[in-house]
Design a protein with these regions (language model features):
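Extracytosolic low-complexity repeat regions of secreted or lipid-anchored proteins
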Residues: 72-124
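Short loop/turn segments at connectors of secondary-structure elements within structured domains
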Residues: 12, 21, 35, 96-98
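Short, surface-exposed binding/anchoring microloops in extracellular/periplasmic proteins
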Residues: 19-53
Length: 127
């Protein structure tokens, strides 16, 4: 892209290419035991923390789903600002520690990986 014509005319050109709609975010949850898990993950960017707090269900998916030990559950989302909003949590109610593991991958790069006992949280910032 050249700006020579814009400099001569004194007009700033419009951006020639649109920025990507967002970043591809992949959330992965695994456990060592078969169980019913409670999983929550951010599926859309809230416009603000106040909007999220007012109605988190508009932005965060909540699932009660079976998970088999060693078999990953994978969820994807497109987020404009994953460094602000990417989060996945998982928990289960077993007497035996299910040893949860979670991971967040943004645009093909692992950005967070955590292990937990009866629950785990991966996020790109403190909540």
């Amino acid at each position: 892209m050249t700006f020579a014509g814009a400099a001569l005319s004194g007009v700033i050109p419009a951006i020639a290419r649109a920025d990507p709609v967002g970043h591809q975010v992949t959330y992965t949850v695994t456990t060592t035991s078969d169980l019913m898990a409670n999983i929550r993950y951010m599926s859309a960017d809230p416009p603000s923390m106040a909007a999220f707090n007012a109605d988190s269900s508009k932005y965060m998916i909540t699932l009660h789903t079976p998970i088999a030990g060693g078999q990953p559950l994978v969820y994807t989302a497109t987020l404009a600002n994953p460094s602000q909003w990417a989060i996945v949590t998982a928990s289960g109610g077993l007497r035996v520690n299910p040893e949860f593991h979670c991971e967040i991958v943004v645009d093909g790069q692992v950005v967070v990986s955590q292990d937990g006992g009866s629950g785990v949280q991966c996020s790109t910032r403190p909540w």
